[in-house]
């Protein structure tokens, strides 16, 4: 048996018919969604980083309930283990920052008239006369400059990964630098071709591959700005590398062109880890090759040039290097809005702006199922899904909250919860349920388990971003009290005003189904029988309140209540955190009493959560020889009131005593 902490569930709590703060500061919720931008990797994220990653304006129209709901978890103080879902045929925004360096020899012109200049054969002075007195042609007066030019239109189409763009960059270098000079001339504008004479030296270098961190439509730009004031004091050139969206600068980092420079034990070289919102990948050997060529053309030693402004042809004080100019017809990598990445798309499977909600499509459902099952159903998928979703030691998830997901996705999440056993699933019945019969139909399609609870209430709310009405399930509002409850008192009932389970955003009159008891039909009793949870209004507070908390398992036991299951799961997570700290400590013989004490110390923190909590070490020599510590934990649960029965008696007045 490997080094793991394993739990076996035994439910001996059949019901008859007659605290310390958890170690995990932020409750961790599992979710998956589409978004306008962001990484495609499964990540943990919280706070403002969520909005920096996925966008500050969350669109219900484009991405449905789940993205807004994820934002509400973040706003309530929760943490997400999440994945941005992307269409299979989406492409990656990218640009290859490519620099051309050329020795251009051209005939100088007279500044005032624009006439070409010549060298008078007799005097050696410059002249505008093409011929001397004897009608011999004068030599053209030429000047050779080293010209730096940043090339445009170096974006690669139909790429899904940065590796594909990188391969294209390497091919680009080979294609450019093996080109005969006459062929190269033909790539230039016609008016520039006559500037080139014999013995032209040139080189074209794709220095950096810049890509978005996830596939999506083009939204980002890159900018490189020289910082001469700071550089002159440091003695080497530094730049500000910026990621920009529209007119907003999202990120600035300080970098150097010199890949080997270390300052105060820190490297400021541009790498693929330089930025959080973009990948900035140096093309191997290109910066060195470019500076070597620049050194060859200018005569400045490489060791000196590498610490100068090789991007803009200046020294560290901002003065142009003698004989070096920057071609203003190239792209301006230091411009206010930077250079925009191109060739990205959202693909065709998920039409964010279409008339049909893509989040009800089979393609979307399949992509979500892939995530929640931890694998890719397409062998050639460039982004295989992460089986670390099964890692119970690293990702201590507390809950996954449904968000109007398709039925098959709800079941995929439930299967994950059944396998892990350490987090709880809050499932909705979609926004299409309006009757008791509708609820039963959805229930019949869902897997039943003690690790999931079902909720049928839906209603309209005001979209906080557009101020329009949108239809949501109660999960939209439920996440806020869930974050608070998991952080403060997960052992208490997940219902009622006293525990904060009020759904305050529901627009009155839009709720789908409010069960009542009539002479013909006891809707409240029937929902109780099938253990479907709901919310209803109470006169005393006027707010929509969650009033039941059944799990979906068939058997009626103490594990038919959400808070009892969640309380045990909290204990599991605490032990799973503590046990690895005590593994491999030498014990005396087969007596693991020291290990028992370590576990008991953890459980002592939870005694107030339960009516009874017993820890029993089951010493077994055979298991001890196999290095296995085996113990039993018995839980008895606190009671609480869900319903009230009052017996009302009418008695004779004579029986009333003073």
Residue ranges and their predicted role:
Residues 390, 608-658:
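Compositionally biased, low-complexity/repeat regions
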Residues 1-121, 125, 129-596, 602-623:
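A glycine- and small-residue-enriched flexible loop/hinge signal that marks low-structured segments
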């Amino acid at each position: 048996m490997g080094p793991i902490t394993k739990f076996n569930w035994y439910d001996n709590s059949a019901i008859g018919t007659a605290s310390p703060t958890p170690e995990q500061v932020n409750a961790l919720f599992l979710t998956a969604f589409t978004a306008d931008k962001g990484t495609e990797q499964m990540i943990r994220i919280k706070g403002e980083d969520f909005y920096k990653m996925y966008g500050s304006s969350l669109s219900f129209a484009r991405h449905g309930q789940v993205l807004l709901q994820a934002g509400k978890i973040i706003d309530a103080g929760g943490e997400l283990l999440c994945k941005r879902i992307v269409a299979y045929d989406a492409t990656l925004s990218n640009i290859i920052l490519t620099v051309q360096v050329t020795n251009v020899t051209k005939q100088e012109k007279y500044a005032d008239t624009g006439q070409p200049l010549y060298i008078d054969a007799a005097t050696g002075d410059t002249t505008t006369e093409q011929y001397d007195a004897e009608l011999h042609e004068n030599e053209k007066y030429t000047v050779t400059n080293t010209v730096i030019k940043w090339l445009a239109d170096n974006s690669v189409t139909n790429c899904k990964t940065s590796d594909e763009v990188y391969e294209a960059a390497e091919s680009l270098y080979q294609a450019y630098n093996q080109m005969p000079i006459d062929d190269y001339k033909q790539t230039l504008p016609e008016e520039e071709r006559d500037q080139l004479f014999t013995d032209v030296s040139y080189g074209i270098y794709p220095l950096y591959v810049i890509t978005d961190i996830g596939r999506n439509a083009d939204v980002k730009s890159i900018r490189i700005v020289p910082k001469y004031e700071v550089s002159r004091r440091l003695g080497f050139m530094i730049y500000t590398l910026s990621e920009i969206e529209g007119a907003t600068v999202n990120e600035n980092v300080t970098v150097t062109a010199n890949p080997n420079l270390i300052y105060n034990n820190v490297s400021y070289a541009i790498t693929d880890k330089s930025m959080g919102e973009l990948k900035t990948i140096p093309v191997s050997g290109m910066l060195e090759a470019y500076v070597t060529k620049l050194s060859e053309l200018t005569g400045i030693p490489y060791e000196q040039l590498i610490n100068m402004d090789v991007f803009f042809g200046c020294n560290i004080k901002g003065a142009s290097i003698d004989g070096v100019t920057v071609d203003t017809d190239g792209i301006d990598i230091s411009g206010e809005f930077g250079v925009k990445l191109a060739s990205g798309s959202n693909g065709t499977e998920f039409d964010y702006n279409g008339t049909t909600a893509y989040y009800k499509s089979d393609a979307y459902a399949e992509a979500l199922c892939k995530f929640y099952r931890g694998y890719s159903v397409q062998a050639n998928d460039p982004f295989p899904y992460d089986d670390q979703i099964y890692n119970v030691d690293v990702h201590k998830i507390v809950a996954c909250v449904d968000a109007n997901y398709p039925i098959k996705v709800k079941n995929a999440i439930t299967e994950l919860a059944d396998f892990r056993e350490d987090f709880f699933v809050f499932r909705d019945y979609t926004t299409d349920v309006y009757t008791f019969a509708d609820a039963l139909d959805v229930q019949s399609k869902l897997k039943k388990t003690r690790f999931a609870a079902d909720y049928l209430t839906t209603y309209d709310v005001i979209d906080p971003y557009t101020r329009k009405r949108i239809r949501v399930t109660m999960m939209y509002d439920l996440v806020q009290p869930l974050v608070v409850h998991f952080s403060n008192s997960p052992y208490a009932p997940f219902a009622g005003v006293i525990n904060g389970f009020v759904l305050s955003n529901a627009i009155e009159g839009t709720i789908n189904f409010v069960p009542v008891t009539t002479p013909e039909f006891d809707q409240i009793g029937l929902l109780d029988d099938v253990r479907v949870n709901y919310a209803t209004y109470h006169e005393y507070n006027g707010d929509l309140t969650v009033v039941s908390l059944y799990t979906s398992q068939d058997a009626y036991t103490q594990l038919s209540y959400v808070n009892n299951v969640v309380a045990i799961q909290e204990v599991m997570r605490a032990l799973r955190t503590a046990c690895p700290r005590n593994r491999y400590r030498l014990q005396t013989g087969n007596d693991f009493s020291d290990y028992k004490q370590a576990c008991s110390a953890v459980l002592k923190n939870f005694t107030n959560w339960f009516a009874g909590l017993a820890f029993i070490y089951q010493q077994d020599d055979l298991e001890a020889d196999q290095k296995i510590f085996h113990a039993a934990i018995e839980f008895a649960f606190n009671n609480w009131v869900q319903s009230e029965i009052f017996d009302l008696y009418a008695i004779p007045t004579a029986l009333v005593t003073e």
